Amino acid sequence: FNSIVDYALKWRFFVMLVTGMAQTFFFYDLETSGLSARDDRIMQFAGRRTDMDFNPIGEPYNLLVALNDDTIPSPEALLVTGISPQKTVDEGYTEAQFVKILNEEIFTPDTIAVGFNNVRFDDEFVRHLFWRNFYDPYEWSYKDGRSRWDLLDVVRMTRALRPEGIEWPVDGEGKPTNRLELITKANGIAHENAHDALSDVDALIDVTKLIN
């Protein structure tokens, strides 16, 4: 039953894509202080809005969010992102300021929020962020024509069902891998700074164009 529900949800988002029911995509990515959506915090948010043909609309967002004093980031997160807590405090928005930007400027009506593994990771951080700041944690992803879409699942489906025309990477043991930075490398897509949120967003848009 769960697999049927999952398939139905993915089919709904696919229909929205090909029919143009929604007006814009907003591709986004997060860099966080750790892996727990409940206990860790967003340190960097980047995103770019496009039309339904993946043409950019307006300027991209690339925002730092100040870590609060009682959040201790994991050393692994700092090594991967290169973002220090001090940098977020010096240059970043407070969570209250950041969540207002998300609510009023980014996740606007008729926006499809798109990411890579976002349904299982990034979206959960956004939900906890809204909850902590007294906003509804779900409306940003369903109300007034809003929805969300995970390109990792599309990549997996494409690799399994229609792999032609795309170079598919394997890991050091020869096993299939769908890591974004390896897909971009295999297909000659510019991705100079993996794990920088804006670089990941631009790479994700290019991979989406490749699949399309």
Regions found by a protein language model. Name each.
Residues 40-45, 49-83, 105-212:
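Metal-dependent phosphoesterase core characteristic of DEDDh/y 3'-5' exonuclease domains
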Residues 81-98:
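Metal-dependent phosphoesterase signature
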Residues 13-55:
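Entry/capping segment at the start of metal-dependent catalytic domains
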Residues 15-17, 102-104, 137:
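Short, flexible, glycine/charge-rich loop motifs used to bind or transfer phosphoryl groups or to couple energy/partner
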Residues 95-109:
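Short, basic/hydrophobic alpha-helical segments
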Residues 1-2, 24, 117, 195:
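A subset of signal/propeptide-processing and intrinsically disordered low-complexity segments
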Residues 33-35, 88, 194:
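Short strand->helix junction
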Residues 1-17:
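N-terminal amphipathic/basic-hydrophobic helices that include classical n-h-c signal peptides
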